[in-house]
């Protein structure tokens, strides 16, 4: 009997805060498919997870960020093609760039209070990442 090996598709991104202030808003994107989530994208060959996150954030939002890689949360789920999806999220703080939206990927970008973001994020495991990020930052809701 032949056992097919599950392929793992890896993406990396970040929970992006507008600043390091405790009450900083968080960036939530609405993908063209209608899901509300964090910026992320596929790891390209020879990239580190951090490099992927920085590149995807710049490509999709125009923002330049500083990553805090001491915070690192992974989510896993199965895709309809039978592959496993693994997302790695860091925390990021905006440090520059000019905000613009990659229109073939996103339909909206929203800066929200974390408590509002929690209410609109599509997937529970992404909401859990936000909870962990807030705890890590010791920031009030």
Where are each of the predicted segments found?
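Short, flexible turn/loop "capping" segments at secondary-structure junctions
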Residues: 29-36
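A short gly/proline-enriched turn/hairpin at secondary-structure junctions
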Residues: 37-41
